[in-house]
UniProtKB/Swiss-Prot annotation:
Location, primary (coarse class): cytoplasm
Function description: Proline-directed serine/threonine-protein kinase involved in a signal transduction pathway that is activated by changes in the osmolarity of the extracellular environment. Controls osmotic regulation of transcription of target genes.
E.C. designation(s): 2.7.11.24
Reaction catalyzed: L-seryl-[protein] + ATP = O-phospho-L-seryl-[protein] + ADP + H(+); L-threonyl-[protein] + ATP = O-phospho-L-threonyl-[protein] + ADP + H(+)
Requisite cofactors: Mg(2+)
Keywords recorded for this protein, A-Z: Activator, ATP-binding, Cytoplasm, Kinase, Nucleotide-binding, Nucleus, Phosphoprotein, Serine/threonine-protein kinase, Transcription, Transcription regulation, Transferase
Phylogenetic placement of the source organism: Eukaryota, Fungi, Dikarya, Ascomycota, Pezizomycotina
Description of activity control: Activated by tyrosine and threonine phosphorylation.
Protein name: Mitogen-activated protein kinase HOG1
A Pfam family recorded for this sequence: Pkinase
Modification after translation: Dually phosphorylated on Thr-171 and Tyr-173, which activates the enzyme.
Binding site for ATP: 26-34, 49
Residue list for modification Phosphothreonine: 171
């Protein structure tokens, strides 16, 4: 039977197995608290994320299940990987992943990035997105704080599956807004992998400039700032707007011409400007893909078609439209965790009694 150790972090109880020691707070996200720790089994430093109240509502249970499924499925050098998962006696869920020293947000706020680092970071972001998109997954919330970096400049994308389309009035998503694709703001309907390319373009611009490209105060201001640089959206984009209020707002904006990005990024390499122009396109269908971006001249120093893999299998989203009670999500979650630990549960009852095993 596994032994659990309790610690108070930011007023939150961390209840972990004795396999992990030296807990230190790393950051607080919207849905969980992250600590660094030492894995006694491997002698590696790891990140442990406690999911807050995973079974308190069906929405939270589903979100946790989605993140678990995605972490299990996505296996790529530029995507964060799961090294352990367990459920504590208090029924909190803990994800254990590799620990990277910092994130792109911290790097960008501490010093300007040199050209070769910008190039290498963007290459790794696009390499990761090529894989993720080939698995049929859209990140939806790509931003500098979701891009982890270690001392060797290895980069990994994290926080998959948590971000959903949020209520425009919802607070606490200010930083997310800066990187949000216009089709999400304009239509709030079906969107696809192109939203991640837009976000990556905003991050690329921020690496070049040292500050956010579109720092909107709210969604209205955000969209207005975008049009100041990229001009008025074309008619085929405007025609996709379903909301009359949104349509009225867009049509009320003054007609604007797209500004050449070379005028804004005066010190950037012309090939960097060309790639950025192809990423920041209003019409998602005309936006460059991750695969195409990897083959762009700007990323030529790192591009290797033989070492930019795609996913072997598409991610199974069949659960995503399910409207299930908490207890059902809990059983499904236990099943996934047991599968991760290569344990077969003979029955649902046995699944629910496996918590002590799962923590070992």
């Amino acid at each position: 039977m596994a032994e659990f150790v309790r610690a108070q972090i930011f007023g939150t109880t961390f209840e972990i197995t004795s396999r992990y020691s030296d807990l230190q707070p790393v950051g607080m996200g919207a849905f969980g608290l992250v600590c660094s720790a030492k894995d006694q089994l491997t002698s590696q430093n790891v990140a442990i994320k406690k999911i807050m109240k995973p079974f308190s509502t069906p929405v939270l249970a589903k979100r946790t299940y989605r993140e678990l499924k995605l972490l299990k499925h996505l296996k790529h050098e530029n995507v964060i990987s799961l090294s352990d998962i367990f459920i504590s006696p208090l029924e909190d869920i803990y994800f254990v992943t590799e620990l990277l020293g910092t994130d792109l947000h911290r790097l960008l706020t501490s010093r300007p990035l040199e050209k070769q680092f910008i190039q290498y970071f963007l290459y790794q972001i696009m390499r990761g997105l090529k894989y993720v998109h080939s698995a049929g997954v859209v990140h939806r919330d790509l931003k500098p704080s979701n891009i982890l970096v270690n001392e060797n400049c290895d980069l990994k994308i994290c926080d998959f599956g948590l971000a959903r389309i949020q209520d425009p009035q919802m607070t606490g998503y200010v930083s997310t807004r800066y990187y949000r694709a216009p089709e999400i703001m304009l239509t709030w309907q079906k969107y696809d992998v192109e939203v991640d390319i837009w976000s990556a373009g905003c991050i690329f611009a921020e690496m070049l400039e040292g500050k956010p490209l579109f720092p909107g105060k709210d969604h209205v201001n955000q969209f207005s700032i975008i049009t100041e640089l990229l001009g008025t959206p074309p008619d085929d984009v405007i025609n996709t707007i379903a909301s009359e209020n949104t349509l009225r707002f867009v049509k009320s904006l003054p007609m604007r011409e797209r500004q050449p990005l070379k005028n804004k990024f005066k010190n950037a390499d012309p090939t960097a400007i060309d790639l950025l122009e192809r990423m920041l396109v209003f019409d998602p269908k005309k936006r460059i893909t991750a695969t195409e971006a990897l083959a762009h001249e700007y990323l030529a120093p790192y591009h290797d078609p033989t070492d930019e893999p795609t996913a072997e299998l598409k991610f199974d989203w069949s659960f995503n439209d399910a409207d299930l009670p908490v207890d059902t999500w809990k059983i499904m979650m236990y099943s996934e965790i047991l599968d991760y630990h290569n344990v077969e549960a003979a029955s649902v009852g046995e699944m629910e009694n496996q918590q002590q095993y799962l923590a070992q």
